[in-house]
Amino acid sequence: MNGTEGPNFYVPMSNVTGVVRSPFEYPQYYLAEPWAYSALAAYMFFLIIAGFPINFLTLYVTIEHKKLRTPLNYILLNLAVADLFMVFGGFTTTMYTSMHGYFVFGPTGCNIEGFFATLGGEIALWCLVVLAVERWMVVCKPMSNFRFGENHAIMGVAFTWVMALACAAPPLFGWSRYIPEGMQCSCGMDHYAPNPETYNESFVIYMFICHFTIPLTVISFCYGRLVCTVKEATAQQQESETTQRAEREVTRMVIIMVISFLVCWVPYASVAWYIFTHQGSSFGPIFMTIPAFFAKSSSLYNPLIYICMNKQSRNCMITTLCCGKNPFEEEEGASTTASKTEASSVSSVSPA
């Protein structure tokens, strides 16, 4: 084995020289230079100061503005709540441990940090599944009388939490375990060694099938059908131009969220699967650290995409930040009025 396994850890370095120590008790500066740990701490600090305000504002603005309380936005708000869980339960812990060069909070803290990181990532994934199914039902109309309402949204939110807990909770109760990974200052599921006592192999297979492959398959199917339907509707002009434009904007926003999720999480999942299928092979701590920390940036992109690509939510956000007045909205209103007046003048002129 090219690593050192302990009661609650696996350090990706052989202990032939005797330098490997428990990541819960000693700094791990034999794995990387101290400046690398400082860089990780600075990165986590950035995610905290950027992730908390934008996710909190997303929640606050939606609660303050009644017109934003639509069923679809329930799912998007659920994403913001999950991101806040990651910020408070995971990022603050990881920043502090990175500053010290090892996981100072012990196995219990590792369980907490790993649980919140996994829970947030899984809620995001299952939210995207619910959004994909919603888009498929609304645009493709497999059920002609279906209308996505408040009850559907509440059930969708509950579903995301149940599925996320089904993935994040088992390691807390003995099916697999959370251990420090990479440079040993953040925690994730154990896919490094078989460990028959915690049934690691069966859990990793269950996780990759039920909580990664299946949801991505559902998302791919829904958007595959959706793209075909949108093309057909555009060609046949079955819907009004305004309706088509609105559906396209929402669909585009959700698709970009899916792509962003894949960009953030597929590298981490791919590296984890590689390590699982090549247990005992040699790999450096940076090999797992970079994709693991990159995946944490997912707490930023969902609210940014939602705000940037949704004009109504963007205007409400600006109104809230500007103490109840949106200066940009006035300019837009003036230009819209001017264009309408011009159009009216043109239409009133009789042909020569």
Curated annotation (Swiss-Prot):
Disulfide pattern: C110-C187
Low complexity composition bias: residue spans: 334-352
Keywords: Chromophore, Disulfide bond, G-protein coupled receptor, Glycoprotein, Lipoprotein, Membrane, Palmitate, Phosphoprotein, Photoreceptor protein, Receptor, Retinal protein, Sensory transduction, Transducer, Transmembrane, Transmembrane helix, Vision
Record topology, Extracellular segments: 1-36, 99-113, 177-202, 277-284
Ranges annotated as spanning the membrane: 37-61, 74-98, 114-133, 153-176, 203-230, 253-276, 285-309
Tissues with expression: Rod shaped photoreceptor cells which mediates vision in dim light.
Residue ranges, Cytoplasmic side: 62-73, 134-152, 231-252, 310-352
Top-rank lineage group of the source organism: Eukaryota
Primary location recorded for the protein, binned into one broad class: membrane
One of the protein's GO biological processes: visual perception
Glycosylation sites: N2, N15, N200
Lipid group attachment sites (S-palmitoyl cysteine): C323
Record PTM text: Phosphorylated on some or all of the serine and threonine residues present in the C-terminal region.
Pfam families referenced in this protein's UniProt entry, alphabetically: 7tm_1, Rhodopsin_N
Annotated compartments: Membrane
One CC-aspect GO term: plasma membrane
GO molecular function, one term: G protein-coupled receptor activity
Family the UniProt entry places it in: Belongs to the G-protein coupled receptor 1 family. Opsin subfamily.
Name the record gives this protein: Rhodopsin, freshwater form
